[in-house]
Amino acid sequence: MKLGIAQTEFTKVKDIVIPDIFYNRMKSGVQDFDKLFGDGLLPGASITLTAQAGCGKTTFALQLLEHLDQAGYDVAYASGEENQYQLAFTCQRLNVKGVKIANITDIDTIAEAMDKNDVVVVDSFQALTTKTKMNSRALEAYAISTLCNKAKDSECVLIFIMHLTKSGQLKGSTLVPHSVDVNMMISHDMENDDDTTRIISVSKNRFGQTIDVQAILGHKGFHIGEKVTTGKKAKSKKDRKSAL
């Protein structure tokens, strides 16, 4: 059963059979990553990964994809921010080898790629384009409708990388985070002077818990620590959530 199927008749909860897809999570095999999504990624889910420049969005996404590739999943990274060689150079530093990368920004082309992959990262949502000329609001609505529906129909996990302004506000409208299933944010840990410390926050999860995890961003990527806040706000979370 696909996530996108809507039921229009009222049914008693006791008579509803939960489809297997809700229990067949895609696991990377790395517990620290899987716990962020509620013990793995739900096939067909759409996710935003938001942060200011330099916080590690690309690094996190590539690491996650590499772990999933090693677990046997087909994964792809569609970049409109860096060319294939720049991205491959970053992958070399992170020891990422199995992720398929390409410079694709066209929405329909990405949708086609989702039929052939289990997880697709789009870097970034703000860089998406169409063959037909549209204003920014129409393009945003088309991207959400096309790609999020494709995720549900194909059971491909879709991850949008999102940018924040220097003031910490989301670039564009807030339609995207309201439309997806999971909102994830990476931010500097305000309680630490160390520039390498990050907080990875899941502030919305339709299929699992919300969670905050402390992580260290080093030259070789993220090391996710054990400091976890589940189901409640961390001290500095209010400011991070205000961007969404």
Predicted regions and their residues:
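Short acidic loop-to-helix transition motifs that present clustered carboxylates
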Residues: 83, 104-109, 165-169
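Walker B catalytic acidic pair
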Residues: 123-125, 163
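Loop/turn-to-beta-strand initiation segments
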Residues: 74, 116-119, 153-160
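Phosphate-binding/switch region of NTP-binding enzymes
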Residues: 141, 145-244
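Catalytic P-loop NTPase motifs of RecA-like helicase/translocase cores
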Residues: 128-129, 167
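The Walker A/P-loop phosphate-binding site
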Residues: 2-97, 108-115, 242-244
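Flexible beta-alpha connector loops of hexameric P-loop NTPases
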Residues: 99-103, 129-141
